[in-house]
Swiss-Prot record:
This is Crossover junction endodeoxyribonuclease RuvC. It is found in: Cytoplasm. Its EC number is 3.1.21.10. One of its GO terms (cellular component) is Holliday junction resolvase complex. Keywords: Cytoplasm, DNA damage, DNA recombination, DNA repair, DNA-binding, Endonuclease, Hydrolase, Magnesium, Metal-binding, Nuclease. Homodimer which binds Holliday junction (HJ) DNA. The HJ becomes 2-fold symmetrical on binding to RuvC with unstacked arms; it has a different conformation from HJ DNA in complex with RuvA. In the full resolvosome a probable DNA-RuvA(4)-RuvB(12)-RuvC(2) complex forms which resolves the HJ. It comes from Hamiltonella defensa subsp. Acyrthosiphon pisum (strain 5AT). Its cofactor is Mg(2+).
């Protein structure tokens, strides 16, 4: 029963979602957000690294999946997002986890069936696919969607 950790990186809020799969059934294990205060970028990156490390220790995932950086019109935002991704990936690498990256359009296409889906559609489908009593917040839903994408695509390519 492989455990998959999905990460939706951000310099202010990093979402995480943990799922497993048993007999082609998705199983929700946990989700949430790592929130960083406005104490400067180095401190934020430290909190993201520590938070991801703690989540890895708690859930012991077999796979680490993260959203790829998209090109942004705001270079500063793209750089901060890249740095947040980097420290999350280092946390996974320090635990010898295999790292998989998925584009946002690919995640939306896999989970919703539409690569241009909005956040509400992603939340709805994540809730439906994981049989959750309520929709997770958008950052956690995006992270769970990344994990679901890995579950579908990795299983497809493994056979």
């Amino acid at each position: 029963m492989p455990i998959i950790l999905g990460i939706d990186p951000g310099s202010r809020i990093t979402g995480y979602g943990v799922i497993s799969e048993k007999k082609n059934q998705l199983i929700y294990l946990g989700s949430g957000c790592i929130r960083t205060l406005d104490n400067g970028l180095p401190h934020k990156l430290k909190l993201i690294y520590a938070g991801v490390t703690e989540i890895i220790s708690q859930f012991r995932p077999d796979f680490f999946c993260i959203e790829q950086v998209f090109m942004s019109k705001n270079a500063d935002s793209a750089l901060k997002l890249g740095q947040a991704r980097g420290v999350a990936i280092v946390a996974a690498a320090n635990q010898n986890l295999p790292v998989f990256e998925y584009a946002a359009r690919q995640v939306k296409q896999t989970v919703v069936g539409n690569g241009a889906a909005d956040k509400k559609q992603v939340q709805h489908m994540v809730r439906y696919l994981l049989k959750l009593p309520s929709a997770p917040n958008t950052d956690a839903a995006d992270a769970l969607a990344i994990a679901i994408t890995h579950s579908h695509l990795y299983a497809f390519h493994a056979h």
